[in-house]
């Protein structure tokens, strides 16, 4: 039986170190990004994202978030450039959000929280598969995008419309022909640092690429995220909210900026 973990008082982030001691490791995520303390690095390259909508596979409520999974057996949907070397394949994207619009993101910017954060998870093709890559220091690259309250975002709607079919934990349905590039902001300026998965097993294998510019989401769209359940069918319903880990100590790491 895998270690049970969640976001409640008993099984939440404060308790994860009991089963996953790396929770107190040297390169944990998320962090608070302080723009005035981030160093502009002119050697950082532009991000090259090449996503093929045909690789979209399914959408799943995993009991912690919901994720959209992609076929990753060839280089159809990839990330290159930026701070990384080589080609990383898109595996899935998922979100973290709060119970209200004043919190929910994992990364914060000078202490400012956003209501939601999108994570696009990629793995380094120098390793044979995702599982292998996830344990390597340069195995994963995750692009983080903040969602900020504003106008309704039509590009989010296809994803949100699918949530009715995966309300409870363990539910999965086909999800086809979606281009994740449509969820990215106009500017791909980013901060980058070496970190970890933000959920157990909290492996320290992630090059984080956090975009400076948020995308918009309306209050009604945020309410749709909160209609999901942590609980399985037949259990007492428990709303999926506040599924974020708070910022972790920087422990001497450098945060670099791709922009001045």
UniProtKB/Swiss-Prot annotation:
A GO cellular component entry from the record: cytoplasm
Q: Where does substrate bind?
A: 198-199
What segment(s) does the record annotate as region Disordered? 1-31
Catalytic activity of the protein: hydrogencarbonate + H(+) = CO2 + H2O
Which is a GO BP term held by this UniProt record?
Answer: hypotonic salinity response
EC no.? 4.2.1.1
Which coenzymes or cofactors are required?
Zn(2+)
Positions binding Zn(2+) in this chain are: 94, 96, 119
- The UniProt entry annotates the active site at 64 (proton acceptor), 127
Query: Which Pfam families does the record associate with it?
Result: Carb_anhydrase
Return the Gene3D superfamilies for the record: Alpha carbonic anhydrase
Is Zinc there in the keyword field?
Answer: yes
Q: What does the UniProt keyword field contain?
A: Lyase, Metal-binding, Zinc
* Listed GO MF terms: carbonate dehydratase activity; zinc ion binding
TM region(s), chain numbering:
none
Protein name, per record: Carbonic anhydrase
Q: Which species expresses this protein natively?
A: Danio rerio (Zebrafish)
Name of the gene: cahz
